[in-house]
A protein has these predicted regions:
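Short amphipathic alpha-helical segments
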Residues: 6-9, 55, 82-85
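Residue-level signal for alpha-helix termini/capping positions
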Residues: 12, 62-63, 95
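Soluble extracytoplasmic domains of inner/organellar membrane proteins
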Residues: 19, 51, 57-59, 69, ...
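A cross-family acyltransferase "interaction/gating" segment
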Residues: 29-33, 68-70, 76-144
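A membrane-cytosol interface segment of integral membrane proteins
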Residues: 39-61, 66
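A cross-taxonomic marker for long C-terminal extensions/tails that follow the last structured domain
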Residues: 138-161
């Protein structure tokens, strides 16, 4: 939730569209509106058929209109700061539907601290740190590319309590 506005700002020239859980489509001023009306894919994580169809449709859209897509393949935010294992199916679908798209890994540090105690107190004194890695062409073995992306992202995650 706290990472979406900075990513939108950083990637504004590339018109980012998000793969986001359906719950974020309501209740967050500006962000929810953008997710619902900006062409993002709102997925029901309990319904894989709906999720994959929405991600596939987004992939076709970004390929046709030369836009960008943002997906968080680790799924749910870690409660400890240690990265979770990537859920690769959604990323594979995007890579298949948008073969000309570049993969731009982004490591986000300290996002788990923002909601460590729930919504109150709200991560006072915590700073989100983004590390945007160089783009990777969507060429070759998808499994190897996903492993490379995961390694880049997890390498730069710093867990300090």
């Amino acid at each position: 939730m706290n990472d979406i506005p900075p990513i939108i700002w950083h990637m504004r020239r590339h018109h980012p569209k998000f793969v986001s859980k359906i719950e974020l489509g309501k209740g967050i001023p500006s962000v929810s509106y953008n997710l619902r009306h900006g062409g993002s894919a709102l997925i029901d994580r309990k319904d894989s058929k709906q999720a994959l169809a929405a991600i596939g449709k987004l992939g076709e859209y970004i390929e046709t209109h030369q836009r960008s897509a943002v997906i968080f393949p680790e799924g749910t935010r870690s409660r400890t700061g240690h990265p979770k294992k990537f859920q690769t199916t959604g990323l594979k679908v995007l890579m298949k539907k948008a073969p000309s798209a570049l993969l731009v890994p982004i490591s986000i540090n300290n996002s788990w601290k923002m909601l460590r105690y729930g919504k109150f107190p709200y991560g006072i004194g915590s700073h989100l740190i983004f590390n945007v890695h160089p783009p990777i062409p969507n060429e070759g073995d998808p499994e190897a590319l996903i492993e490379q992306v995961e390694a880049l992202i997890t390498r730069d995650i710093q867990v300090d309590l």
